[in-house]
Amino acid sequence: MAELATIARPYADALFKASTQQGADLSGTVAWAEELAAIAANPQLRQLADDPKVTDEQLFDVISGVAGSALPDAARNFLRVIIENGRLQALPEVAAQFRSLVNRAGGSSDAVVQSAFPIDAAALAALGTSLEKRFGRKLNLSVQQDQSLIGGIRVVVGDEVLDTSVKARLEQMKAALIA
């Protein structure tokens, strides 16, 4: 089976082109695409989708029923195409690639800030400003708590990592002492 990224790329590109041509709210499209992706990633839903007795229409009804919000027509049409083409397993990757296209068009990137302790809103805003200067682009920050860091933060932006955690410093000292 081909890589999911390869399967997902044309769907993400088509969704991006259709959304921009129709003047759709891209952040709203990202929201419903990620909601559908989260539903499609559910193991029980995957099991249902693999059942040959379940029709495409039944699967569509289940997914649209599970979706917390009323899906816009574009989302419903997109979901139908994904299901009819048997690409439900690729939907999480489609959503990730679509978000990447939207970020690239807007000149921004997603950044994951990992911290040993909770970060309050004011500190996160200040951190965001300094990280945007450091990385040279607007960042969409999300925070994950990871107590194994001991202290400090670790920031992941795409394939770039800025690690100022105590854990990383201890590992650097250990490597220096062993060498």
UniProtKB/Swiss-Prot annotation:
F-type ATPases have 2 components, F(1) - the catalytic core - and F(0) - the membrane proton channel. F(1) has five subunits: alpha(3), beta(3), gamma(1), delta(1), epsilon(1). F(0) has three main subunits: a(1), b(2) and c(10-14). The alpha and beta chains form an alternating ring which encloses part of the gamma chain. F(1) is attached to F(0) by a central stalk formed by the gamma and epsilon chains, while a peripheral stalk is formed by the delta and b chains. Belongs to the ATPase delta chain family. F(1)F(0) ATP synthase produces ATP from ADP in the presence of a proton or sodium gradient. F-type ATPases consist of two structural domains, F(1) containing the extramembraneous catalytic core and F(0) containing the membrane proton channel, linked together by a central stalk and a peripheral stalk. During catalysis, ATP synthesis in the catalytic domain of F(1) is coupled via a rotary mechanism of the central stalk subunits to proton translocation. This protein is part of the stalk that links CF(0) to CF(1). It either transmits conformational changes from CF(0) to CF(1) or is implicated in proton conduction. Transmembrane segments: none annotated. NCBIfam families: ATP_synt_delta (TIGR01145), PRK05758.2-2 (NF004402). GO terms for cellular component: plasma membrane; proton-transporting ATP synthase complex. InterPro entries: ATP_synth_OSCP/delta_N_sf (IPR026015), ATPase_OSCP/dsu (IPR000711). It is a peripheral membrane protein. GO terms for molecular function: proton-transporting ATP synthase activity, rotational mechanism. This is ATP synthase subunit delta. Its main location: membrane. The keyword Cell membrane applies. It comes from the Bacteria. Keywords: ATP synthesis, Cell inner membrane, Cell membrane, CF(1), Hydrogen ion transport, Ion transport, Membrane, Transport. It is found in: Cell inner membrane. The lineage of its organism: Bacteria, Pseudomonadati, Pseudomonadota, Betaproteobacteria, Burkholderiales. It holds the Pfam family OSCP.
